[in-house]
């Protein structure tokens, strides 16, 4: 590891600790004596995002974070919530085991996470992601949020079980 202060290639590790997704190391340069911190993280195999125009772009967590931060700007959210969402989405994408994922899947994942976190951030992101061209489209999303309907479920879609057949008596009780 080269020293960031004098560029000498010889440094020694003073302290090493496990952090959330890697290892944090405190290092000291043997020439200038300056101390600095490095982080080691697992670098998964390349993951590519297939855009609407079929271009392929390497997945960039910083780009995801930037979009999330813009949507959540000036919102009273818990510290680290945006970073957690980005980390969760990244983990889900890599767990899929695919080399390429469509940008629509990534956008839908962000929408789902933001909807659970903050409605205003959700609407902000949706307005850019869904490319609203007029106020009626925005109003429809807001109305769906207020009424509790999910955009992905159509009114004509049948439920898994009819409402009259589901009763609290059918639950199993512990013995």
UniProtKB/Swiss-Prot annotation:
It holds the Pfam family ATP-cone. Binds 1 zinc ion. One of its GO terms (biological process) is negative regulation of DNA-templated transcription. Residues 47-137 form the ATP-cone domain. PROSITE patterns: ATP_CONE. Its cofactor is Zn(2+). A zinc finger (unnamed) spans 3-32. Keywords: ATP-binding, DNA-binding, Metal-binding, Nucleotide-binding, Repressor, Transcription, Transcription regulation, Zinc, Zinc-finger. GO terms for molecular function: ATP binding; DNA binding; zinc ion binding. PANTHER family: TRANSCRIPTIONAL REPRESSOR NRDR. Negatively regulates transcription of bacterial ribonucleotide reductase nrd genes and operons by binding to NrdR-boxes. Belongs to the NrdR family. This is Transcriptional repressor NrdR. It comes from Dehalococcoides mccartyi (strain ATCC BAA-2266 / KCTC 15142 / 195). The lineage of its organism: Bacteria, Bacillati, Chloroflexota, Dehalococcoidia, Dehalococcoidales.
């Amino acid at each position: 590891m080269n020293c960031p202060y004098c560029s000498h290639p010889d440094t020694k590790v003073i302290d090493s600790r496990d952090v959330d997704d890697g290892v944090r190391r405190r290092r000291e340069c043997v020439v200038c004596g300056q101390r600095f911190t490095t982080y080691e993280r697992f670098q998964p195999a390349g993951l590519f995002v297939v855009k609407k125009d079929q271009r392929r772009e390497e997945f960039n967590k910083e780009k995801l974070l930037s979009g999330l931060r813009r949507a959540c700007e000036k919102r009273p959210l818990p510290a680290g919530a945006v970073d957690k969402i980005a980390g969760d989405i990244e983990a889900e994408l890599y767990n899929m085991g695919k080399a390429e994922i469509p940008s629509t899947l990534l956008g839908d994942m962000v929408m789902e996470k933001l909807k659970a976190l903050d409605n205003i951030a959700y609407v902000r992101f949706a307005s850019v992601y869904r490319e609203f061209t007029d106020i009626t489209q925005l109003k429809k999303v807001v109305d769906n949020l207020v009424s509790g309907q999910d955009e992905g479920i159509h009114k004509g879609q049948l439920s898994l079980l009819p409402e009259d057949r589901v009763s609290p008596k059918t639950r199993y009780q512990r013995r």
